[in-house]
From Swiss-Prot:
This is 4-hydroxy-7-methoxy-3-oxo-3,4-dihydro-2H-1,4-benzoxazin-2-yl glucoside beta-D-glucosidase, chloroplastic. Changing residue 520 to Y: 19% loss of activity with DIBOA-Glc and 2.5 fold increased activity with DIMBOA-Glc. Its main location: plastid. Belongs to the glycosyl hydrolase 1 family. It is found in: Plastid, Chloroplast. GO terms for biological process: carbohydrate metabolic process. InterPro entries: Glyco_hydro_1, Glyco_hydro_1_AS, Glyco_hydro_1_N_CS, Glycoside_hydrolase_SF. It comes from Secale cereale (Rye). Its EC number is 3.2.1.182, 3.2.1.21. Optimum temperature is 25-30 degrees Celsius. Homohexamer. Disulfide bonds join 259-265. GO terms for cellular component: chloroplast. Keywords: Chloroplast, Disulfide bond, Glycosidase, Hydrolase, Plastid, Transit peptide.
Length: 568
């Protein structure tokens, strides 16, 4: 779910936000008065090395350079069980915002109430019109030879009031989509929640700021399991909670748009130092309740999997020094560990506890036991990397999410003056495939090598790029994806248990704060021609890539198999 922000970010807010306010807000805390651009990320004070960085691959250079033919990845590099697919989210593609009984979501409310917060003043009312054109999306997947499709369920489409009586027409839409995917041999992977909370719950008690959301989310998740679980065997409870909490409650540039008084956001009535942690805590509790319910009642045959999709960023030390090595560890831990550590070990990273203090809620012993080791699969959404640089801050410094993020800055340029990689059409994404390899090896070495899917990975086309004047000739995206698919193979060769790669995204869509000005799709949406789907160069490459007969592929990947079939 890529994103970009509209509006001007306050350079004095110092919020450690991930560079994706549509993926458009580099770590907002690093925006200086000169509007320097940096990145997302969170940091922790671990003294243990968070994985050994992989050996540097061939330098990319300061600009995009196309791969040589022998460097381009081949399908037979991977086992036949390895899954290639694409991802989307409900609000970004569906449209039909008030049709067939759907209730308003927080994003409907945000875009309608604060249109100035979207860079082009648009909204998701129509989006890519996938509510009416989902068969075209399925056809595009089929044409590309994709075996899996990850999409999300709109909570307010199937539960207009967030709770209570379900909306059967909304359920019918997802049943029709799922059945169409299966008819075409494509396996559905479902994200239960991708940022679009029912506005009714926001109005009733403040959404994820109130613990009531835990039971209401559990009710929503159970409705999904009941309605779709006979065919959907792979679930993600939440998508990118880290980004959501920072941008929605810290910086206020995403729905519901809350921040502290005095900051520039839609609703300056919040507490940017506490609310992100409160919302995140309730997300984790809701995840635990839903997963426990799923395992107790909706996976009787043991053929289904459930997990969470985390937004992650790679980091390298700013220079070869102990302090910057430690800064790198803190960066990785705050960026990835905030939500990953609780679902693996039952609590937040030690560094977060020590730095944030009483602003970070506590788990009860029962909650810790329920949280830890619940995930069957992990999703990693990776786009880019940064350099981590140690920052000295006096002990009496006023707390901010930046200083929590732990005495480290996130830089696009290293101590030698070189950028971490070539910048893409989207200013916050610098291409650095090695960062993905390193993170996968961290998952292997530090977190027990769980089954991992790359649930998002891609770049955007932007209007006015002189190197890509034709929106269908997206050679930069193709080069980016080829290099990152190769990076996944590097990690697999070193023992990481990676099961699949989902490109973000399937189609051009509403990119949050950037509206429609940033296009992440493999498939072009022609707004001037009734949202007609047109395959880009990258999509046509996938069609060729995926055409290798299965008989020529290896049987397993790292001796690990994955359930890739469903019963109708």
């Amino acid at each position: 779910m890529a994103l970009l922000v509209g509006g001007t970010l306050n350079p004095t807010t110092h919020l450690s936000l991930r560079s994706r306010a549509g993926r458009n807000s580099e770590n907002v805390w690093l925006r200086s008065a000169a509007s320097s651009q940096t990145s997302k990320g969170r940091f922790c004070n671990l003294t243990v090395r968070a994985g050994t960085p992989s050996k540097p691959s061939e330098p990319i250079g300061p600009v995009f350079t196309k791969l040589k033919p022998w460097q381009i990845p081949k399908r037979d590099w991977f086992s036949k069980d390895f899954l290639f697919g694409a991802s989307t989210s409900a609000y970004q593609i569906e449209g039909a915002w008030n049709e067939d009984g759907k209730g308003p979501s927080t994003w409907d409310h945000f875009c309608h109430t604060y249109p100035e917060r979207i860079s082009d003043g648009t909204n998701g009312d129509v989006a890519a019109n996938s509510y009416h054109m989902y068969e075209e999306d399925v056809k595009a997947l089929k044409d590309m030879g994709m075996k899996v499709y990850r999409f999300s369920i709109s909570w307010s489409r199937i539960l207009p009031n967030g709770t209570g009586k379900p909306n059967q027409k909304g359920i019918d839409y997802y049943n029709n989509l799922i059945n169409s995917l299966i008819r075409h041999g494509i396996v559905p992977y479902v994200t239960i929640w991708h940022w679009d909370t029912p506005q009714a719950l926001e109005d009733k008690y403040g959404g994820f700021l109130d613990k009531q959301i835990v039971n209401d989310y559990k009710y929503f998740a159970e409705l999904c399991f009941q309605s779709f679980g006979d065919r959907v065997k792979n679930w993600f409870t939440f998508n990118e909670p880290h980004t959501y909490c920072c941008f929605s409650y810290g910086e206020g540039i995403h729905a519901p748009g809350r921040c502290s008084p005095g900051l520039d956001c839609a609703v300056p009535e919040g507490d940017s130092l506490r609310e992100p942690y409160t919302a995140g805590h309730h997300i984790l509790l809701a995840h635990a309740e839903a997963v426990e319910l799923f395992k107790a009642h909706y996976n009787k045959h043991g053929d289904s999997k459930i997990g969470m999709a985390f937004d992650v960023m790679g980091y390298e030390p700013y220079q070869d020094s102990f302090l910057d090595d430690q800064a790198r560890e803190r960066s990785i831990d705050y960026n990835m560990g905030w939500f990953l550590e609780p679902v693996v070990r039952g609590d937040y990273p030690f560094s977060m506890r020590s730095l944030i203090g009483d602003r970070l809620p506590m788990f009860t012993k029962e909650e810790q036991e329920k949280l830890g080791s619940l995930c069957d699969i992990m999703g990693l959404n990776y786009y880019t990397s940064r350099f981590s640089k140690h920052v000295d801050i006096s002990s009496d410094y006023t707390p901010t999410l930046n200083t929590d993020d732990a005495y480290a800055s996130s830089e696009t340029t290293g101590s030698d003056g070189n950028e971490i990689g070539p910048i893409t059409g989207t200013y916050w994404i610098y291409m650095y495939p090695k960062g993905l390899t390193d993170l996968l090896l961290i998952m292997k070495e530090k977190y027990g090598n769980p089954p991992i899917f790359i649930t998002e990975n891609g770049i955007a086309d932007v209007e006015g790029d002189p190197e890509m004047p034709d929106p269908l000739d997206d050679w930069k995206r193709l080069d980016y994806l080829q290099r990152h698919i190769s990076a996944v193979k590097d990690a697999i060769d070193q023992g990481a248990d990676v099961r699949g790669h989902f490109t973000w995204g399937l189609i051009d869509n509403f990119e949050w704060g950037s509206g429609y000005s940033s296009r992440f799709g493999l498939v072009y949406i022609d707004k001037e021609d009734g949202n007609k789907r047109k395959l880009k160069k990258s999509a046509k490459w996938f069609a060729k890539f995926n055409s290798v007969p299965k008989t020529l592929l290896k049987t397993t990947n790292n001796n690990a198999t994955v359930t890739a079939s469903v019963s109708v």
